[in-house]
Regions:
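Nucleotide/phosphate-binding sheet-loop regions of phosphoryl- and nucleotidyl-transfer enzymes
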Residues: 1-297
Length: 297
């Protein structure tokens, strides 16, 4: 957007176009601008928004992380609405992951694979899982990462609000139920450096959660989400309800989704199983704002 080059004290309305438009035949059109007296303006990002839904929630979060300078595996977005584009860093691995990107986040519902498969057949299969006419905004072709450790983390306003969880190897099992706290000091140290860097952007991003992979040298960010409900200990979402209904991790994520659909307003969820707060189970409960806590067995 080279032609949108205004000082900070200007308000600018513009549009971005895949084809060249306007009298200057460019990809950006400026519709209106006006100058204001210079003053401090608080800038805060929030998504889902119209653009994140345009390319898919997961793709949008990774673009934000890449823009802010974090290690994001080299990613090509194959979207419905725009031509393919690539961002991120080379991981040194030539294997390709393929990841579906729903319009809005639906934790653990759609396919992520660590090897390439027919993307056209995949889209047909995954669309059938959704409840709308169109559920998938894009697919990601992503450079693989050598996963020595993987997991999730929540980055709060200060370190006392932080949460780190993970497992050895790939994070698929962790996100859908397997839980292990014993990460090495080296991994925790690397994670804390990355989390503090995210915290330096707190005014812009607010409280965020990440999915991460450690390859022995670097922490790679494979998902970035904003969260509205901060978890604490075994509590996923705080709230005052008259009773809690049991939901078992062993029954899977779809069972939890079905239970939420029929849950009374004055009822919460007791999630039973060895699962992490930053797992997809926790994501689903936070996203639906269901008062909930974990009972580990």
């Amino acid at each position: 957007m080279r032609n949108i080059n205004f000082e900070d004290n200007y308000r600018v309305e513009f549009s971005i176009h895949p084809m060249r438009e306007g009298i200057k035949r460019g990809h950006n059109i400026i519709w209106e601008f006006e100058e204001f007296s210079k003053e401090e303006i608080e800038v805060k990002m929030e998504w889902p928004n119209k653009f994140s839904q345009f390319i898919g929630d997961k793709a949008y979060g990774l673009i934000v992380a890449d823009y802010l300078g974090f290690n994001v595996p080299q990613t090509t977005v194959i979207a419905r609405n725009v031509a393919p584009f690539t961002f991120g860093k080379d991981t040194g691995i030539y294997e390709r992951w393929i990841r579906t990107v729903p319009i809005v986040k639906e934790p653990g519902k759609y396919f992520t694979g660590d090897k390439w498969c027919d993307p056209f057949e995949l889209m047909v299969q995954e669309e059938r899982k959704g409840e709308k006419d169109i559920n998938i905004a894009s697919l990601l072709s992503q450079k693989g990462v050598e996963a020595l450790y993987s997991g999730g983390a929540i980055i709060g306003n200060n370190e006392s609000e932080d949460l780190i969880e993970g497992v050895k190897g790939k994070g698929d099992d962790f996100m859908t139920g397997e839980y292990e706290e014993n990460l090495s000091d080296e991994v925790i140290g690397k994670l804390k450096e990355v989390m503090n860097k995210f915290r330096s952007h707190n005014k812009l991003l607010g409280t965020v959660s990440i999915e991460w992979v450690y390859d022995g040298k670097e922490i790679w960010i494979v998902q970035l989400n904003q969260i509205r409900n901060v978890s604490d200990g075994t509590v996923i979402v705080e709230g005052n309800v008259s009773s809690y209904e049991k939901s078992y991790v062993s029954e899977g994520l779809e069972s939890l989704r079905d239970k939420i659909k029929t849950l009374n307003k004055d009822t919460g969820i007791e999630l039973i199983g060895n699962v992490g707060i930053s797992s997809h189970f926790g994501d689903v409960l936070r996203q639906n704002k269901i008062p909930s806590f974990i009972t580990r067995i």
